[in-house]
Amino acid sequence: MFNLNTKSSKEPEVTEVAVDSTPSSPVTRESSPESSPDNSAVDLEKGKKSKFEMHDQTNLLPRSQLFLVFGAMAFCMLVSFMDQNGISVALPDIAKDLNATDTISWAGTSGLIANTVFQVLYGRLSDIFGRKLVFMIVVCTLVCADIGCACAQTSTQLYIFRAFSGIANGGMSCLTMIVVSDIVTLKERGKYQGILGACVGLGNTIGPFLGAAFTENVSWRAIFYLLAPMGGLCAVVIFFILPSKKPQGSAIQKAKAIDYPGLFCSSVALVFLLVPIAGGGSYYEWDSPMVISMLCIGGVFFIAFFVIEGFFAKLPMMPLRIFGTKALFALMMHSVLLGIAYYGDLYYLPMYMRNIRGWSSMKAAGMSCALVTTQAVTTVISGQYLSRMGRYLEVIYFGFGIWTVGAIMKCFWKRDSNMALLIFSLLFEGAGVGCCFQPTLVAAQALSRKEDRSVVISSRNFLRSFGGAVGLAVCSAILANSLKADLKTKNLPSELYELIVKAPFSLPDLSHYPEYRDQVLDAYMNGSHTVFVFLCPIVGACLLVTVFVKDHGLQTHEKKAAEAKTVEDKDKDESGTDCEDMTKGEVLVSEKEGKLSRNSSSQSMHFGDHTAVNTPAPTGYNTPVVGTLCHNSPNFPPMDHNDVITPLEDFDESPLPPHSPNSSGKRVTIQEE
């Protein structure tokens, strides 16, 4: 028997049909619109045979199980973002407790750098070792890191454990999106990714609230004592609920498949680039030998990384083909710019509220709800729109447009700005973020190959984190340099000036200097204004870059390529070629279903990316694909190339006889016109 993959003429679903030696065939259904062969031993970058066989981990679930697994993924995403942003409002208190007022920004920077360094790796690791195993490792890492943060006695210990938290959080957010992409179809993916985006906003809301509540009433350490068991619950849920399609191959084969040169070069490049960028202007002088040498080394390894990925890696962590079209390149640029703007807001809005407005941690967290709650709501709405309408471009345009309006409004903030201006600015920005985060991801998946699904997600998250790290470093330098320049013009006591310059992110106690309070707050306001002005054109650039994104609907890259090919083949057939240019052993389906070819030597049938082997088809049958068959192979049974193919839904179905090798399927009676 030979197998053939096609779809119903009414629904965007793939139907696998097996035609045996009688005019009957079993039918099974797979609800995914994405199609690729399982265990394809193909070098994904160069099309050559690879020693490691990639395993298709698509695992479409029945609805009841889907809701359970997706709920677990949503909970993991919530915990991850609670952990990432829960300590932002507590940093001033942590700095005082650990005597680290001049270095406390590294509590956030260390996690973000570690997140960025490892983010690019998770896609390929999950391809090689399986989603479940890698997921369990990163969740256990998060639990251990949070326990370490809770027990930290020095700032150095805290920064190290926050770095491990960053490694784990990067894996959790990335793998959650990959798993959801495995268990739902592309058409439904916008809806489910939208709910995940809502969990991001919810985590960004709950985390600061819990951090503020624990800091003011218990201790900042209590935040981590809460997050650690929540992470443990994630591990238990993943272990018992997440289904696993374990990739084939031995542990040695899997270990050899890792792109070690790429991993080494990317890690060295990012560390050597981000550390001086994060500390330049505040902890290190920009023209110091250390900063210059680290930037040069990082730049060299960054170039080496892309050379390795493009020309030498057999299984690259970041295949350069994901930048190969204008649309995909624009979407990846979105990720970098979006990371700069979004992380800048997350870190510098609370600073404005606490340092300049003098609000408590709880009030600052409450004001931030205007942004993150709106983000959560609009993410769900935009995801529903994507799934129902099958389009994404107008959502992305609207998102970056309204985000730009909010960023412009933020540039008019003053020390005494009224609440209406603040709230509407945050509402507009939150709505914009909600319409950009997940729709850009769904668009990138729709425009890329199925086998690139995991690396598209990890690369996109990596670029967003990289943009965030660079953006925070630049914003930090802008604020520090603005404060220095502004305070030099004021007649401040030297001890107060040195105190501010050494720790620009932690407002000193001005009760001892009441006469200088307004001057210091004005300097902080000018610095924050400069940061907001810097972020505004970044968002505007995202809007401009969107013109390069094309909306082809929620179809897979393979399906669009197949349709383009068959349209060309149909044109040839209608122009009178009558299949004359087909090579021996081929059959052409000249409608919108792709090219069907048979290799007579291996007795195999190919449809698109799918292959089915065994015996030839019987004489006098019609393949259940809507279209017209043409063939010129003597090895094929005779058939009229003008026979009209009966639509699948017109076939009569009956149970297979007990002797059938596919007894779990259904018999389809082939009908001829």
Swiss-Prot record:
Residues 564-596 have a biased composition (Basic and acidic residues). GO terms for molecular function: citrate transmembrane transporter activity; transmembrane transporter activity. It catalyses: citrate(in) = citrate(out). The chain crosses the membrane at residues 67-87, 103-123, 133-153, 164-184, 194-214, 222-242, 261-281, 292-312, 322-342, 364-384, 393-413, 419-439, 465-485, 529-549. Residues 1-44, 564-608, 636-673 are annotated as: Disordered. It is a multi-pass membrane protein. Glycans are attached at N99, N217, N526, N599, N662. Transmembrane transporter that exports citrate across the cell membrane. This is Citrate exporter 1. The lineage of its organism: Eukaryota, Fungi, Dikarya, Ascomycota, Saccharomycotina.
